């Protein structure tokens, strides 16, 4: 694979106004993508975005570039990332573009592409776009220019798709649900999905102004959701991130239910229904309790590198249909092609309604092991993890934790940091073990 100059693991991302998140680069990127896609017979691309104020600027620039290459753009407005993947497929568009920086602050933004199948673009297409970016823009003849249009019922189409994953014989009638949309792309989708399925919905984080996305709300900051659930005596709270591909939940007692617990609830329900295909993919950060709980049910479990992209790769490699991260990216491959917060939350609500159990009762099957995370800064070019002394201490700790805990030591890819993670059923043992490793790292 050729080295990438522009595309990272999740498209192009950065601070607005700083290369590459500038209007001139977005126009050039639209043109380059348009040229590559047009050479394969493409004619229409869908463009969706989250609620950042910079989305207007970037979608206009992308559309201009696409038009110059002869491709038409269909705008679908603020829309969750998984909705863009779904609509790209159902509209038979040749590609989809998402303008979002997910859980980042409003002053960041990003651009990523979906294939016609609603999946990540093949590596060879991304590489061809990178190569085209090095060429000067040349505009097609006037008669061949692309056009711009708007799909006005995109939100309604996705709402119906989400509702279609909830069993028709069940209802959310009688449930009081607090929905926190992070002032992001799900603000006009998630509350309507829950309401139309019968729930009483209390909304927070549904008043985007272009600059308040992910600000003290949503899946990455759920204090407001916990408070609202307790204040209103709600049955459950749902928190999505800015682009709607993550979900975190809160039970009626105010306890957070994270991605690991959500993954277990869905896996167990699929197993009961005879719908679980293969096993479950987690990540290096997935709690050991998830692994133990799944294996108790006879469900295979493997770990991928951190990042939903790597989870999906392992799922495809093993032909498994369920995977996710403790951060709330949950991929249910027989329902959508990417992480989908609304679909995942509906899968948990299905289990609640089906068995008439609270979220607290469902999640209690996975008692998460305490996790201790410590970042250790080091100087110099030598990686402390390669030291024999550190390796010896790590091996001793692993031996001590055998069967009841684990360690994960990683060197940061962007800073001179060693990330030390220890988890164990015994919180005090986890803390002492982490401190022991940290001291060894500092000494080297």
From Swiss-Prot:
One of its GO terms (biological process) is UDP-N-acetylglucosamine biosynthetic process. Keywords: Isomerase, Magnesium, Metal-binding, Phosphoprotein. Its cofactor is Mg(2+). Binds 1 Mg(2+) ion per subunit. This is Phosphoglucosamine mutase. It is an enzyme of class 5 (isomerase). The modification Phosphoserine is found at residue 102. InterPro entries: A-D-PHexomutase_a/b/a-I, A-D-PHexomutase_a/b/a-I/II/III, A-D-PHexomutase_a/b/a-II, A-D-PHexomutase_a/b/a-III, A-D-PHexomutase_C, A-D-PHexomutase_C_sf, A-D-PHexomutase_CS, Alpha-D-phosphohexomutase_SF. Mg(2+) binds at residues 102, 241, 243, 245. It catalyses: alpha-D-glucosamine 1-phosphate = D-glucosamine 6-phosphate. Catalyzes the conversion of glucosamine-6-phosphate to glucosamine-1-phosphate. It holds the Pfam family PGM_PMM_IV. Activated by phosphorylation. It comes from the Bacteria. The keyword Chloroplast does not apply. The active site is at residue 102. Disulfide bonds: none annotated. The gene is glmM. One of its GO terms (cellular component) is cytosol.
């Amino acid at each position: 694979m050729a080295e990438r100059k522009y595309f990272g693991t999740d498209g192009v991302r950065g601070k607005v106004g700083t290369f590459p998140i500038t209007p001139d680069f977005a126009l050039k990127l639209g043109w380059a993508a348009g040229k590559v896609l047009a050479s394969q017979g493409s004619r229409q691309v869908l463009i969706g975005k989250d609620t950042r104020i910079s989305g207007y600027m970037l979608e206009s620039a992308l559309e201009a570039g696409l038009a110059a290459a002869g491709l038409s753009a269909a705008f679908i407005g603020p829309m969750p990332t998984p909705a863009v993947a779904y609509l790209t497929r159902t509209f038979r568009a040749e590609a989809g573009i998402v303008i979002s920086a997910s859980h980042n602050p409003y002053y960041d933004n990003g651009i990523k592409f979906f294939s016609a199948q609603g999946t990540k673009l093949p590596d060879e297409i991304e590489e061809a776009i990178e190569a085209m970016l090095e060429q000067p823009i040349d505009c097609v003849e006037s008669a061949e220019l692309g056009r711009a249009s708007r799909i006005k019922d995109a939100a309604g189409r996705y709402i119906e798709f989400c509702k279609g994953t909830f069993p028709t014989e069940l209802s959310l009638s009688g449930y009081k649900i607090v929905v926190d949309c992070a002032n992001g792309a799900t603000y006009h989708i998630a509350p309507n999905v829950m309401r139309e399925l019968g729930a009483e919905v209390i909304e927070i984080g549904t008043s985007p102004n272009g600059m308040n996305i992910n600000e003290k709300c949503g899946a990455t900051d759920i204090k407001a959701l916990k408070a609202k659930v307790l204040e209103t005596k709600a049955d459950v709270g749902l928190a999505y991130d800015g682009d709607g591909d993550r979900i975190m939940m809160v039970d009626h007692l105010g306890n957070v239910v994270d991605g690991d617990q959500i993954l277990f609830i869905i896996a167990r329900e699929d197993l009961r229904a005879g719908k679980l295909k293969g096993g479950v993919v987690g990540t290096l950060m997935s709690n050991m309790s998830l692994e133990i709980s799944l294996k108790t049910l006879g469900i295979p479990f493997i770990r991928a590198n951190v990042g939903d992209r790597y989870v999906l790769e392992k799922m495809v490699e093993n032909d498994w249909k369920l995977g996710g991260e403790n951060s709330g990216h949950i991929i249910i491959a027989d329902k959508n092609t990417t992480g989908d917060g609304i679909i995942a939350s509906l899968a948990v609500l299905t289990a609640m309604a089906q068995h008439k159990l609270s979220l607290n009762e469902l999640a209690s099957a996975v008692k998460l092991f305490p996790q201790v995370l410590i970042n250790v800064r080091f100087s110099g070019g030598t990686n402390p993890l390669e030291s024999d002394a550190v390796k010896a201490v790590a091996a001793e700790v692993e031996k001590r934790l055998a069967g009841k805990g684990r360690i994960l030591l990683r060197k940061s890819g962007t800073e001179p940091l060693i990330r030390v993670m220890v988890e164990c059923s015994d919180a005090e043992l986890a803390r002492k073990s982490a401190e022991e490793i940290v001291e060894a790292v500092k000494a080297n």
